[in-house]
């Protein structure tokens, strides 16, 4: 009930991305999860916060030939908000994953904030190597299989050149499907996912100190720029899913 929600100046929300994600079934507003946006609109209509920040996946820009985006913009504008949206990439904000997400930044019209432009981020580049734990417990993350194939040429650092700003695939597990691809720690990581199968589900696999392994939950926290004192869920499956669903902290703080 919207009346039970305390008054607030800023509403932050993310209607579930699975309804619009390329990796999902892309049912959009036909998915009950996608209709959560209209619950957000209902809360906005009741409380009239000064500012709104909403987040969703890149695919929402073109979902249903642009009709989904048009509905979102028209709904927010109809509630008397000036609406701006930006496609932001995680690797531009000091984390080693591209993770492109759309952010809707809205100002109540009576505040008279017009022509809003988000300034350019100024973060140092990070590779996966920069977020690794020093002595992690490998019991739950190391992948030991006899169908691992590594391309030795691709792990030679002299060959990397300017490819550090994207994931560098250096091998596969089994047939190399989703969750079965191996990457170098000297590039960015793949986008963390809340779902997916394969030996390296949710994080991807990396060659680290001669071993093939997934990222630890703490490394996933760092991939999302969570602080070191953030308490991680003890249930590791839940923790991986939470980080796959999370928003990059640095981006929200920057906005």
Q: Where is each model-derived feature located?
A:
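S-adenosyl-L-methionine-dependent DNA methyltransferase catalytic core
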Residues: 75-79, 101-255
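A short acidic, often aromatic-flanked loop/helix-cap motif at beta-alpha or helix-coil junctions
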Residues: 1-2, 90-95
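A secondary-structure boundary/capping signal
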Residues: 16, 56-57, 89, 107
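Residues at alpha-helix caps and immediate loop-helix transition turns in enzyme cores, especially N-
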Residues: 64-68, 100, 251
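Core alpha/beta nucleotide-donor-binding catalytic domains of modification enzymes
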Residues: 1-51, 58-70, 77
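Short catalytic/ligand-binding loop motif for oxyanion handling, primarily in non-cytosolic enzymes
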Residues: 18-22, 60-63, 94-97, 111-114, ...
């Amino acid at each position: 009930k919207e009346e039970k929600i305390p008054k607030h100046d800023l509403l932050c929300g993310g209607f579930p991305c699975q309804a619009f994600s390329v990796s999902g079934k892309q049912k959009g507003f036909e998915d009950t999860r996608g209709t959560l946006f209209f619950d957000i609109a209902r809360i906005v209509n009741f409380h009239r916060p000064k500012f709104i920040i909403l987040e969703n996946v890149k695919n929402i820009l073109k979902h249903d030939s642009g009709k989904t985006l048009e509905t979102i913009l028209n709904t927010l504008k109809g509630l008397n908000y000036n609406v701006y949206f930006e496609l932001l990439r995680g690797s531009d904000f000091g984390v080693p994953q591209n993770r492109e997400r759309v952010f809707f930044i809205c100002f109540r019209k009576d505040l008279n904030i017009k022509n809003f432009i988000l300034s350019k981020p100024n973060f140092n580049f990070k590779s996966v190597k920069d977020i690794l734990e020093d002595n992690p417990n490998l019991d739950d993350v190391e992948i030991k299989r006899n169908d691992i194939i590594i391309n030795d040429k691709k792990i030679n650092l002299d060959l990397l050149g300017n490819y550090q700003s994207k994931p560098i695939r250096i091998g596969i597990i089994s047939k190399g499907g989703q969750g079965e691809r191996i990457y170098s720690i000297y590039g960015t990581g793949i986008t963390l996912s809340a779902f997916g199968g394969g030996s390296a589900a949710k994080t991807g696999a990396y060659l680290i100190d001669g071993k093939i392994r997934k990222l630890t939950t703490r490394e996933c926290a760092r991939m999302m720029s969570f602080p070191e004192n953030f308490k991680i869920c003890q249930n590791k499956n839940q923790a991986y899913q939470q980080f796959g669903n999370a928003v990059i902290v640095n981006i929200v703080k920057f906005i």
